[in-house]
Amino acid sequence: MEAKDKLAHRIKHLCKKNHISYYTLSYKSAVPMTTLMHIINCSTKNPGVFTIFKICNGLNITIKDFFDSEEFTDIEYEEY
């Protein structure tokens, strides 16, 4: 699984766990709904650390908490 897929999966999981809709997350994090949906649908290759930071704020978690998951232990890095 690629990093962008893992990001999408983690956001979906945290929204479900916290009973928060994507719309609510978009509002709370000040990330436009279209941007959030591009991340969730994996059409954004690299959402950027600041966007992930804002999403974490919307979820009331730290970036460390976001990435502190089994799914991020074996990320495949792409060379550009």
Regions found by a protein language model. Name each.
Residues 32, 43, 70-74:
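The DNA-recognition helices of helix-turn-helix-type DNA-binding domains
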Residues 15, 40, 51:
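DNA major-groove recognition helix of helix-turn-helix
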Residues 15, 26, 56:
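The alpha-helix within a helix-turn-helix
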Residues 1-20:
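A short, Lys/Arg-rich alpha-helix, primarily the initiator
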Residues 43-54:
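Short, basic-rich loop-to-helix N-cap that marks the start of a DNA-contacting helix
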Residues 13, 38, 67-80:
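Short, charged recognition helix plus adjacent turn
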Residues 12, 23, 53:
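Residues within the helices of the helix-turn-helix
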Residues 19-38:
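Short alpha-helical DNA-recognition segment
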